[in-house]
Amino acid sequence: MMIRPKMGFIVFGVHKDGLKDPLGVPFINQKIIDESKAAIEAKGVELVENEIVVAYKHEAREALARLKHDDSVDGVILFSGTWVWASEIVAAVRDFERAGKGVIIWTVPGSQGWRLVGTLALGASFKEIGMKYRSVYGSDNDTVEKVACFSRACALRNKLNMTTIGAFGGRGMGLTCGCADPSQFMREFGVDIDSRDSMDILKAAEEVTEEEIQDVKENLIKPYFQEMPPDDGCTERSIRLYLAVKKVIEKEKFDMYVIQSFPGLAEEYAASCFTQSMMLQQGIPTATLCDYNNVLTVFLLSNLTPDPVYYGDFQCIDKEKKVVKVIGDGACAPSLAGPDKARFAHHGLPTEGSAGGLSVEAVLKPGKVVMGRIGRDNGMFEMILHRGQVYTPDPDDLKDQRTESGMWFWPHAFIKMDVDYDYGVQVWDSEYITLAYGDEEMYGTLKEFCYLTDIKLIEM
């Protein structure tokens, strides 16, 4: 699902209302304003325009208060029209920004109109009071994209605010790097963590009807898989588990969830691979092993791509070829498979769930991807961010690559990554790589999100 930001658009400048310079040219160039609005709207940003050019305190107060109290507005683009007395605007912008909405100043080049001078005076005033803002200069596509990325990041931060992570179980498989401080999640992101006992899921699983199971087979399995799964108890329990988790998170109104899976349900009922695969397929952010850092990463990526998100073990590196192998623990949104459709397998590891369960066998389709991971270093949030290219090895090599891990029946992604792998191994924040299909728009938006939320950014 691609998030669509909504930004206020306010032109500022004191030399307004048709005032002309000594050459008889209006200080404020309406053509530049119109072209800039059209350019940013073409990037998918919805604008809420102000009717007048803002120059004075009462105008700024009225314009920004209206945007502040509109919950659908994510931030404001302050478009430089000409020189401005910064003191007339600063207080109203400060009040707006403290409501959790982003502020960016956009200046189009040109000597006529004295636009840059107004921008620098205003931006320096924001610095004086310690206010977070962005300022960009240009009218080219790269600059417009910077404005769009910042706008999307504002929308992403606002969408994350006041969400709830549902938790089923506790730390899975000793994954210390996935644990969370609930107070920190609330303080930094406005996210609540609310736990439920896994018995709620088991009870819901028992109540699933045969009609519901058949509906899943017809509408979720048939369209995405080469063949139907075996008609056995393992398949039935896997489908029941998926439906049960879906019902519980809908009942509790969880925006995303984490599940322990093992030890726990994977020993007593079924592994959660099929459940996780179908949730990711439907764009519901989730993470196994109660990995809170991963579910936060999945949430961010899910809102920036039309495709499902994938995560798996950072399983092997070939430093010479600069490629990596990422193997999911049986879970993968089936629509990511390509060119061949996904298949079914059994989970296959009794030491990670003796009850068994359906897993997804797939090789990920080729394409550009952005990979990220939110984690913590000494309690402080950071995000590792890099780009890659998923590719499909030649048939013989593909068979060997899948076989050598011993888990050929689990999802595989083969990714070209031109990075410093020694540095990566040192700083990586988990066993997982989490990725989404996308390019510069996604990458730039995640960078701006880190800026807005004071997350340390590590680019590889």
Q: Where on the chain are the PLM-derived regions?
A:
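N-terminal glycine-rich anion-binding loop in soluble enzyme alpha/beta folds
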Residues: M1-V54, T176-Q226
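Short Gly/Thr/Asp-enriched flexible loops that form oxyanion-binding sites at enzyme active sites
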Residues: T82-A99, A266-S277, P411-V419
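Peripheral docking tails and interdomain loops at the edges
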Residues: M2, T107-C149, A153, L280, ...
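Cofactor- and metal-binding active-site motifs of prokaryotic enzymes
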Residues: V53-N161, G172-G174, K322-I327
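Extended hydrophobic packing segments that form well-structured cores
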Residues: Q30, A355-M460
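C-terminal catalytic subdomain
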Residues: G283-K399
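A charged, amphipathic alpha-helical module
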Residues: C154-A270
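N-terminal small/polar loop signature for handling phosphorylated ligands or for N-terminal nucleophile
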Residues: N50-E97, T209-E252
